[in-house]
Amino acid sequence: YFIGVPLLVSCEALATYVALRAVELFASDRLLIAVWLFRLVQCEAFYLLTVALKRLIIGKFAAGKRPGTLRDVLRRWLLDRFTRNALFLGATEPYVNTELLSRKYRLLGARIGKRVNVDFFDSVEYDLLDIGDEVVFGSCVVLAPSDDAEDLPIRIDDGANVLDHSVLLGGVTVERRAVTGTCT
């Protein structure tokens, strides 16, 4: 908490500062546009800070036995706090079912194929996700490649459907054109 919380608050403050500087460019008679721009810039700046944190401090997640060290726990906790933040959600949720959301997940380390209908999904270890071409996601999907003992990749083959409220655990392969039912 002595490292993670100040880092999270500092990144929120930096994103807000960047957004405020962008709003200063508008005249006062364009206030409605300025408010919209503020929120957009704030969320996108926080998202970019999250990507930088992932690449520079947290690093990649690899399949195998979890080390169980304090550093490992801290990096998972930090990324979880950043990806559950309202500013991160504001930078990802508006792009549901678009190629832009796939690109944003790729920047975090996920391997996502072409023409993937990605809804917002919950995950921390993006490096352990391998999603094929033409995959369809439902809403509220949880991809959890990690447990207390080990990290295992999750593979979703071409043309598969992962429907609403599904939870996929580490080591799972959803085969080509398979469909997971709702709440599985």
Language-model region placement:
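Structural signal for interior beta-strand "rungs" in well-ordered beta-sheet cores
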Residues: 105-184
